[in-house]
Amino acid sequence: MRKIKLIAVVGPTAVGKTALGIELAKTFNGEIISGDSQQVYQKLDIGTAKASKEEQEQAYHHLIDVREVNENYSVYDFVKEAKVAIDTIISKGKIPIIVGGTGLYLQSLFEGYHLGGEVNQETLMAYREKLESLSDEDLFEKLTEQSIVIPQVNRRRAIRALELAKFGNDLQNSESPYDVLLIGLNDDRQVLYDRINRRVDLMIDNGLLDEAKWLYDNYPSVQASRGIGYKELFPYFSKQIPLEEAVDKLKQNTRRFAKRQLTWFRNRMNVEFIMVGEENYQQKIKRKVSDFLSSK
């Protein structure tokens, strides 16, 4: 069976994934699937760095604004809905282009491990999400508790070993139906951090405080409120800290998040990054995509 060709644009926040995804969609007759766990929420546009209405008019976006703010969203939901979006795009004769920085979502979509049946698949992904939330120390402690020995201790092997221990023969390793071209974007660290700081300032100027205050007043305890861009501002609204301190915390958390994203994509998905500061980097990427799409 011939595999479905997918393009995936990944990398840290603020590196330029949205702009590149739109450019590739326009060049190669594609549609975009958002691979971001926060952009699924309606009414949360600024803090999630959602593609603007103008950007969405340039290329159709799937999996944006598909949940109410008070609804939960899981890796299982993403995989199920992304597969539907892929099939829809393919049926139009177009190329699916996945753009996002939520590594667990993308990895779970691309790999072939699964359990038989809908309910079991949801169980597997919920368990994986739980393991991913653990620190390295707690994760490796679970290996020790269950007397699991793996040849090389790293997070990916540890999580796979724990999944096998829990689900045993029910965990099937089927071949992925997708042939994925991973395009990783990165930039000089200080340049990226400066861009993050400027973007936070721009978000504040564009109305992030009003957006976050609405969330704080109406849905302070939902899953969406725990995302970066909102939780840092809640202590300001409750008069615990001044605005300047809250904004500094938001910048700091975003920079740390970018670092974690880079680590994830390097270590878990073996992404080779292209530096956006390189001359003609978009042209190089377009040639790479063209070669990929024309190959059998």
Swiss-Prot record:
The keyword ATP-binding is annotated on this UniProt entry: yes
Site described as Interaction with substrate tRNA, located at T102, R128
Q: Which cofactor does it need?
A: Mg(2+)
Per UniProt, where does ATP bind?
A: G11, P12, T13, A14, V15, G16, K17, T18
Q: What keywords are assigned to this protein? A: ATP-binding, Magnesium, Nucleotide-binding, Transferase, tRNA processing
S-S bonds: none
> Would I find Transit peptide among this entry's keywords?
no
Q: Which InterPro entries does the entry mention? A: Dimethylallyltransferase, IPT, P-loop_NTPase
Q: Which residues bind substrate?
A: T13, A14, V15, G16, K17, T18
Broadest EC class assigned to this enzyme: transferase
Swiss-Prot/TrEMBL GO biological process terms: tRNA modification
Primary role: Catalyzes the transfer of a dimethylallyl group onto the adenine at position 37 in tRNAs that read codons beginning with uridine, leading to the formation of N6-(dimethylallyl)adenosine (i(6)A).
Tell me how this protein assembles: Monomer.
- Write down what this protein is called: tRNA dimethylallyltransferase
Its lineage reads: Bacteria, Bacillati, Bacillota, Bacilli, Lactobacillales
Protein encoded by which gene:
miaA
